[in-house]
Regions:
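Extracellular low-complexity Ser/Thr/Asn/Gly-rich intrinsically disordered segments
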Residues: 1-221
């Protein structure tokens, strides 16, 4: 004797996450390590699918088992270039797929630890004179060339960081105060990374001449 029943088989599709572009971050100290916002391309990875949860892992095994997810910002553990694994899981079916995400540190321009101040004498005592900022160009650039790097000078740190309002008359700049801090911006034209530094313009005032008191001596003769 036997009986029959109808059994419905349902095959749920797995998510189809998009492979993201590498996440590139400028490395301020050029040691190959920095913090990454690993969620940068999350919407691109989801690729318009509904009910998808994204999580990130250091190893493929962890991604497959959904253990030890990473938290953003993430500090890379492999210098210069590291692959992490992105798990895209359907909240309704539990089906998942995994794609790789590359993390890349970009080298930043190298500035001297200390940029030497420019000190000039002031002949008229008003604390103002003309400075040639370009005399620091070679010290700042070092082995870096103007073919690959752009050097600009700025009056504020904010302008140096954003690249706004560069000083135009760099070879004949008149100081605004004494001393005055000048901010340096060095940009890598290949990767867009920027380093900033500073040095002072100092006007050395002439000494104040004091009229001596007349010296009187008695003449015994």
């Amino acid at each position: 004797c036997y009986s029959t029943i109808t059994l419905d088989l349902r095959v749920n599709p797995i998510p189809s996450p998009a492979v993201p572009d590498p996440i590139e971050v400028c490395d301020e100290d050029n040691d190959g390590f920095t913090f990454f916002d690993i969620e940068t391309y999350e919407s691109d990875i989801i690729n318009g699918e509904l009910d998808i949860t994204i999580s990130y892992y250091e190893t493929l095994t962890n991604a497959q088992n959904a253990v030890e997810p990473l938290v953003s910002p993430y500090f890379n553990i492999v210098p210069d270039s590291q692959i992490i694994f992105v798990r895209a899981e359907n909240d309704l079916t539990g089906c998942f797929n995994i794609v790789e995400q590359e993390l890349v540190t970009l080298p930043s321009p190298v500035l001297p630890v200390i940029i030497e101040d420019i000190i000039l004498c002031d002949q008229d005592g008003d604390g103002v004179t003309v400075f040639d900022l370009t005399q620091r160009d070679d010290d700042i650039l070092g082995d870096q060339t103007t073919v690959d790097f752009e050097l600009t000078y700025h009056e504020t740190l904010e302008d140096a960081e954003t690249g706004d309002n560069p000083i135009i008359n760099t070879s004949s700049y008149v100081n605004l105060s004494n001393p005055q801090t000048i901010y340096v911006r060095l940009e890598d034209l290949n990767n867009g990374c920027v380093s900033t530094g500073e040095f002072d313009l100092i006007v050395s005032l002439p000494p104040v001449i004091i009229q001596p008191t007349p010296l009187e001596l008695c003449d015994d003769e």
